[in-house]
From Swiss-Prot:
This is DNA-directed RNA polymerase subunit beta'. It comes from Phalaenopsis aphrodite subsp. formosana. One of its GO terms (cellular component) is chloroplast. It is found in: Plastid, Chloroplast. Mg(2+) binds at D489, D491, D493.
Amino acid sequence: MIDQYKHQQLRIGSVSPQQIRAWAKKILPNGEIVGEVTKPYTFHYKTNKPEKDGLFCERISGPIKSGICACGNYRGIGTEKEDPKFCEECGVEFVDSRIRRYQMGYIKLTCPVTHVWYLKRLPSYIANLLDKPLRELEGLVYCDFSFARSIAKKPTFLRLRGSFEYEIQSWQYSIPLFFTTQGFETFRNREISTGAGAIREQLADSDLRIITDNSLLEWKELGDEESAGNEWEEKKIRRRKDFLVRRIELAKHFLRTNVDPEWMVLCLLPVLPPELRPIIQIDGGKLMSSDINELYRRVIYRNNTLTDLLATSRSTPGELVMCQEKLVQEAVDTLFDNGIRGQPMRDGHNKVYKSFSDVIEGKEGRFRETLLGKRVDYSGRSVIVVGPLLSLHQCGLPREIAIELFQAFVIRGLIRQDVASNTGIAKSKIREKEPIVWEILQEVMQGHPVLLNRAPTLHRLGIQAFQPILVEGRAICLHPLVCKGFNADFDGDQMAVHVPLSLEAQAEARLLMFSHMNLLSPAIGDPVSVPTQDMLIGLYVLTIGNPRGICANRYNQSNSNCRNYKKEKVYKNDFKYTKELYFSSSYDALGAYRQKRIHLDSPLWLRWRLDQRVVGSREVPIEIQYESFGNYNEIYKHYQIIGSVKIEICCIYIRTTAGHISFYREIEEAIQGFWRAYS
């Protein structure tokens, strides 16, 4: 469909019977109205032509061959001659055969039928809207029981119950036995209600605004109730409040989309165009048919049987009518979702028939395989690996993938810079991988984001935009913090990369889809970019240290003098140091690490600013050293305080590691960058 802004879109939902009839109804030039499928036949076994008013009728769906009617007459399509537009003998229009791909039909159901997707699928929309148990509604739909209509001050048959000396055990089975078909219909229309018609009456009588107001009022009353301390009652109230919220949202959705709840009960059943459920002739003259055709035939057979019972057989018991209505309901259920009520319907080879649900849903369904799973231009695919040097909004593209994705842009750049005179020469330079090619590719990629997608795309974070960076190898590099949104890890997962071409797509990628702009879950608001797996292990290794602090040296056998807190440690590089080093700034400490004088977990003393207190109020120093000039040194578990007689505290040294310093610097720079960006 096309909306008021001329955007092509697809909407799936309930439609009215009038809309279904409008889709399928067709008025021929002679004034005859066609569109209703009344016969369960497909092709005649002798002529191999579609049966009239059958599932492949040419009057309803159009001719099999363009411009040729069922009689074999030919008329040119689109000619301006005064030839008739349809054949008066067979009633087939002279139109293009492609009409059979979208011209629908319909089956007029003798009794209302509940749509099984709205009844049996969880959550059950019908049960939520009517606020009734699903088991009770199922029994009503499949004629297992019925309820009495409210007829005030009128004598009714059901009021005789209780006047007898004994009670009839099961009225739902005994009542129809006393009536003929015509009498039972009169009785049922007057006093009882059962089947999908009863559901339709209740849905038609429901006022969505009243449902919303009453549900909201009940929700507030439950919230105002004081807790009784009973865990079971609190759980029951919480479950009821959740149900009321779902009911309010469902009612608002019906109001917002202008959908009547009674449309969930079908009176007209749409019939798919013939080309979407074909019958194909294979070698040997055998026919292969879509499973949908057999399910449609089953519905038409049972519907016609019910029509005959109501129209001709006046002596048929009412119980037989109810049983036939149940069979029609089950046939339509099988058409929509085979096996939803138990054992699925099978063919002669014990193969399960594929219903609408099987055709649509799943990885091999119509949407994911045919519509969403298509290969597109300007896209690639590769395994993902971790990129520890990437920023959050960057991804690493292998040169082989990048040159293919941006080849058209590189060719344009080569021609504009007069490096190549035409497209052929430009492609040859790309094949030879000349240095100028990579320079132009770098320029193109700087201003062009790419989209990364990991299947299955279950929510909007499954596809995000990144700034591409050229990397070596054949794997896509990804920042580990964005893995949670994709539900990805680095154990062999593959991701697809797409290039947005239009200016609108590039603007959407930059403004809405960049990874650093999708840090919170759109569903619950929790952070998505949180460290997991590899990052947690890396942070642990980076900040590992002895929790005992300086006390770890006290009982070290390699220390001959505990007072100097010496610690001898041998590393793989075969160098030793016997004293913990002192550094005046974090820059000096990281410089020593880069010069390989210390390791990430090497303990060291770092001078700390006096305005940032690290002293515990009740902590007792391990040792206090005094000097001859009055200076003193208080040694604690994780820090030292150096003071003098004139100045209480001259400086503070904290005991840390190069890994802790590096981690702190990264956090500090990130916070400062955040404040600069938003100040």
